[in-house]
């Protein structure tokens, strides 16, 4: 798939990714409204890939293998789909869950499908001085190594949260469209190079 942007699979568009690094999408969270009331007990009993424990959580948890995803299905007809690696896969998975519900006899529709969160990650392949970064970008950074090993960077534009690790591994979360993930990474990349650790 040309649009996946997997490292090493095809030349990187340097216009869009001046750093030469394209974050890989790891998880897409989407929601959809099936627009009908659901009997969760019936679904749990009749669908073979479903679990339902109302004492623990008020939704049926359903899984499919392709695309490898998990859905939370609520009695209201609202559904959350997690685990897909691209927007198209997330929508395809959500449609498959909707079809399963239809086959069980519910008049499920497919309304208001929406990507709620995109999680991406990448590796800048050099170590980063997190203390220095946290000090000079104090307004956006929280870094408490005894609580969590990564620096949490809350970017304002686009509104993305980045987890930055000493190793040079970066996690980006909070995007609604993949370009926000890419823009956030390009914004932070010069900062990361500025706080590059010198290898002894």
From Swiss-Prot:
One Pfam family hit: TBP
UniProt entry keywords in alphabetical sequence: DNA-binding, Nucleus, Repeat, Transcription
UniProt-recorded Gene Ontology molecular function terms: DNA binding; RNA polymerase II general transcription initiation factor activity
Major site of localization recorded for this protein: nucleus
CDD domains the UniProt entry points to: TBP_eukaryotes
Taxonomic superkingdom: Eukaryota
SUPFAM superfamilies xrefs: TATA-box binding protein-like
Localization per record: Nucleus
GO terms (BP aspect): DNA-templated transcription initiation
GO CC annotations on file: nucleus
Sequence repeat boundaries on the chain: 25-101, 115-192
InterPro entries associated with the record: TBP, TBP_CS, TBP_dom_sf, TBP_eukaryotic
Quaternary assembly: Belongs to the TFIID complex together with the TBP-associated factors (TAFs). Binds DNA as monomer.
Function: General transcription factor that functions at the core of the DNA-binding multiprotein factor TFIID. Binding of TFIID to the TATA box is the initial transcriptional step of the pre-initiation complex (PIC), playing a role in the activation of eukaryotic genes transcribed by RNA polymerase II.
PANTHER family on file: TATA-BOX BINDING PROTEIN
Family the entry assigns: Belongs to the TBP family.
Protein name (Swiss-Prot/TrEMBL): TATA-box-binding protein
Organism phylogeny: Eukaryota, Viridiplantae, Streptophyta, Embryophyta, Tracheophyta
Gene name of the record: TBP1
């Amino acid at each position: 798939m040309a649009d996946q942007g997997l490292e090493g699979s095809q030349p990187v568009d340097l216009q869009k990714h001046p750093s030469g690094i394209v974050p890989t999408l790891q998880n897409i969270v989407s929601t959809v409204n099936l627009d009908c009331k659901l009997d969760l007990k019936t679904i749990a009993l009749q669908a073979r890939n479903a679990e339902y424990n109302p004492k623990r959580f008020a939704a049926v948890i359903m899984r499919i293998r392709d695309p490898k995803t998990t859905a939370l299905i609520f009695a209201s007809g609202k559904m959350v789909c997690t685990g897909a690696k691209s927007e198209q896969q997330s929508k395809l998975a959500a449609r498959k869950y909707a079809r399963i519900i239809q086959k069980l006899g519910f008049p499920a529709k497919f309304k208001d499908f929406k990507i709620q969160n995109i999680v991406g990650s990448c590796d800048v392949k050099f170590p980063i001085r997190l203390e220095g970064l946290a000090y000079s970008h104090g307004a956006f950074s929280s870094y408490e190594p005894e609580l969590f090993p990564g620096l949490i960077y809350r970017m304002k534009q686009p509104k993305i949260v980045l987890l930055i690790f000493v190793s040079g591994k970066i996690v980006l979360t909070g995007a609604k469209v993949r370009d926000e993930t890419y823009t956030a990474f390009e914004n932070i990349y010069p900062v990361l190079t500025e706080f590059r650790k010198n290898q002894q």
